[in-house]
């Protein structure tokens, strides 16, 4: 049996979303595969365990767990990291535990945690 790719693509193009969904289910059943694993490979890594998920994670949150004894230095560090004004930074420090920065790269997050710890705060990378 000859296979014509152009005819197949034309047939796919004319299908509705429901028909495409049925086709995907039929392919999964026939060949014993899962479309979810192909569509989202990162999701499979997250299900593999905490260590694998931590290695693949690309966005991190910097959490101020406790301001410590030297609140003034911590407020200055928060202002440097976030660009917040004095009142906003003070409110953030007083309301600990709070997220200082969210969704940032690992290197930036580690630098922010280091700066907060050097100022006397307890900070975490999540």
UniProtKB/Swiss-Prot annotation:
The keyword Magnesium does not apply. One of its GO terms (cellular component) is cytosolic large ribosomal subunit. CDD domains: Ribosomal_L7_L12. It holds the Pfam family Ribosomal_L12. InterPro entries: Ribosomal_bL12, Ribosomal_bL12_C, Ribosomal_bL12_C/ClpS-like, Ribosomal_bL12_oligo, Ribosomal_bL12_oligo_N_sf. One of its GO terms (biological process) is translation. The keyword Cell cycle does not apply. GO terms for molecular function: mRNA binding; structural constituent of ribosome. Keywords: Ribonucleoprotein, Ribosomal protein. Disulfide bonds: none annotated. Forms part of the ribosomal stalk which helps the ribosome interact with GTP-bound translation factors. Is thus essential for accurate translation. HAMAP family: Ribosomal_bL12. Belongs to the bacterial ribosomal protein bL12 family. NCBIfam families: L12 (TIGR00855). Homodimer. Part of the ribosomal stalk of the 50S ribosomal subunit. Forms a multimeric L10(L12)X complex, where L10 forms an elongated spine to which 2 to 4 L12 dimers bind in a sequential fashion. Binds GTP-bound translation factors. This is Large ribosomal subunit protein bL12. It comes from Acidovorax sp. (strain JS42). The lineage of its organism: Bacteria, Pseudomonadati, Pseudomonadota, Betaproteobacteria, Burkholderiales. The gene is rplL.
């Amino acid at each position: 049996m000859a296979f014509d790719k152009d005819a197949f693509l034309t047939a796919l193009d004319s299908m509705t979303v429901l028909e495409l969904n049925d086709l995907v289910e039929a392919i999964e059943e026939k060949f014993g595969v899962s479309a979810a694993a192909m569509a989202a490979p990162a999701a499979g890594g997250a299900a593999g365990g905490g260590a694998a998920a931590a290695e693949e994670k690309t966005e991190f949150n910097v959490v101020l767990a406790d301001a410590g004894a030297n609140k003034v230095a911590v407020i200055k560090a928060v202002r440097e990291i976030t660009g917040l004004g004095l009142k906003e930074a003070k409110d953030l420090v007083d309301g600990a535990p709070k997220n200082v920065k969210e969704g940032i790269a690992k290197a930036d997050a580690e630098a922010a945690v280091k700066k907060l710890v050097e100022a006397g705060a307890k900070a975490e990378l999540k």
